[in-house]
């Protein structure tokens, strides 16, 4: 379960105070699929980044499965984040790594053997229908293929929670439908 209690996020832009989030209270149950909608600049991405503390809220608490993330040290937070997959709008793939290496990257700090990592990568490549592209580099892929690599990477650690920040916004309608079906299947 995810609970957000009185989450606020304040930025300062050239000395001017900007309240991106103000007293947000939400809760999400396991298995629930929730969409956050709003105008451009409304704070949707900021809210998602506050959930996994990629951006700490200015005030408030983020509680996941009874653990208050705001109180954790860096090491504890890294462990929790292994169970939170994040799919970004702009893929965030490493250009100098093959698709396989991009997908295996989150498993680097795990206790899995090389063989187990390779097997997990193969499973994920099959899931996102990119087995034949495993030795390709991001520059050799279409936007939809890059997004599928991003999804596979987000799923590498078998997360309990998947956060998607406009995961289909730059895709054509056919690829969008494929990605949404894939995310529903994973759920």
Model-flagged regions — what are they?
Residues 52:
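Helix-to-loop junction immediately C-terminal to a conserved catalytic motif
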Residues 67-68, 108, 114-132:
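Conserved ABC ATPase "signature" region
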Residues 97-104:
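Short coil-to-helix segment of the ABC ATPase nucleotide-binding domain corresponding to the Q-loop/switch region
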Residues 137-141, 145:
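Conserved ABC ATPase signature
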Residues 158:
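Conserved catalytic motifs of ABC-family nucleotide-binding domains
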Residues 162-165:
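Catalytic Walker B motif of ABC-type/P-loop ATPase nucleotide-binding domains
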Residues 173-175:
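Helix N-cap at the start of a conserved alpha-helix in ABC-type nucleotide-binding domains
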